């Protein structure tokens, strides 16, 4: 039913694209399921029953959230502010996808964060008819799947909906950009100056979702870019720290910098990675004979990364009908 090649259906600008598998010419009646299954890139839906409504646009940023107020201001809030600055005429709203974090922030700080459902209801009540959703996820894993599902559940309520891809999505196939390389070029400004005995370990979250395979792609691109002293590992997926330590020893590295590649520098960065407990990554590496430094900053603090999220917002807005 689907051909082997990917064809770009719409090109909105440099690096902006929404793609789909090219359907075989023999397919006469394209079912909604087939159309949905063949959609790649920015997702977009236009509700035929609401086309008479006036366009009133909003951007909704979806994030897992964090209970760390200091890193929230430097990361999530900073990304949202950057998107708002890039689109001054379109209001930016926010939704937290973690109900646990919503409850903890409310209890600790008295701040009420909205769930995605609450945010969509607010937008509907305030008369917004077109909503561009921007996910602050790094890869298309379990959390991005949740963002996708909950957005698609709103199709009957809005004239148009779109959902941007996460930070990394396309991998340079069929003329698409290699967003893994784009990501590495954005974060390499954080890497310390390294000598022959120095290595940097970038810590990802990890997931049981098949999207975990992106970490292998990241390592492949790291090597292709000649970053032979940079290694990716994850807290809850593969590769993990135990997979990387033998590589460090085999190459004779003695000094290691640990650095998270997560939106926020929250619990995983402060405790799992840089904590003083014997099972923290810092402690494990120190016990293994390495001198360890830590870089405790979330991706949202990086201006280059914020620029990539602005681009994701641009792509989601560009999907709307003119």
Listing of model-derived features with the role each one plays in the protein:
Residues 21-257, 263-322:
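Extended amphipathic ligand-handling, pore-lining, and cofactor/metal-binding catalytic surfaces
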Residues 1-19:
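Sec-dependent N-terminal signal peptides of Gram-positive bacterial secreted proteins and lipoproteins
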